[in-house]
């Protein structure tokens, strides 16, 4: 009975790792952790920023779409700057994606569309999430991907 597939060293890890990034300190730590994991597993790192549908600036007449697009551009520029510093020592494959919606729905959509094998997010820094539930808790409860929460 040699029909069983033989174990191949280095081929059983995740192929796509999604990291949620919103600019908070914990999300940057999560992205760094995910980058290390992706590098070691030779996986694709998909960094995802979810643009909010409504922002506080909308109440004051600020152009919300332009503001959130600007945030996405700034995050991407910071990521590219960090990646260029390590390019000579690492062959990390990464992509930057933006999705629109609330963070849970956006990360869920991204993880589904990108066929994520794992999702990495930062721990919530907002006090209200103790009552409503953080994005990380909601992703875990969805039970569709392994989720790592980085403090």
Residue spans of the language-model regions?
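Small/aliphatic-rich secondary-structure junction motif
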Residues: 6-61, 142
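General small-molecule cofactor/ligand-binding pocket signal
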Residues: 48, 95-99, 148
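A short acidic, glycine-rich active-site loop
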Residues: 64-77
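Short secondary-structure boundary segments
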Residues: 49, 122-124, 151
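Short, acidic/small-residue loops that bind anionic groups at enzyme active sites
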Residues: 142-151
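Structural beta-alpha unit
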Residues: 1-12, 84-119, 126
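Glycine-rich, Arg-bearing micro-motifs that act as flexible, cationic patches
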Residues: 118-142
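Short, hinge-like loop/turn segments at secondary-structure boundaries
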Residues: 62-66, 113-115, 137-138
């Amino acid at each position: 009975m040699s029909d069983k597939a033989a174990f191949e060293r280095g081929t059983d890890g995740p192929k796509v790792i999604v990291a949620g990034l919103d600019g908070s300190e914990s999300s940057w730590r999560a992205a760094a952790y995910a980058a290390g994991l992706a590098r070691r597993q030779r996986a694709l790192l998909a960094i995802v920023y979810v643009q909010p549908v409504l922002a506080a600036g909308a109440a004051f007449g600020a152009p919300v779409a332009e503001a959130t697009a600007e945030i996405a551009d700034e995050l991407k520029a910071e990521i590219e700057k960090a990646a260029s510093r390590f390019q000579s020592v690492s062959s990390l494959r990464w992509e930057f994606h933006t999705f629109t919606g609330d963070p849970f729905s956006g990360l869920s959509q991204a993880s589904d569309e990108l066929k994520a094998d794992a999702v990495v997010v930062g721990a919530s820094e907002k006090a209200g999430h103790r009552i409503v539930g953080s994005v990380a808790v909601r992703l875990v409860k969805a039970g569709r991907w392994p989720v790592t929460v980085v403090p």
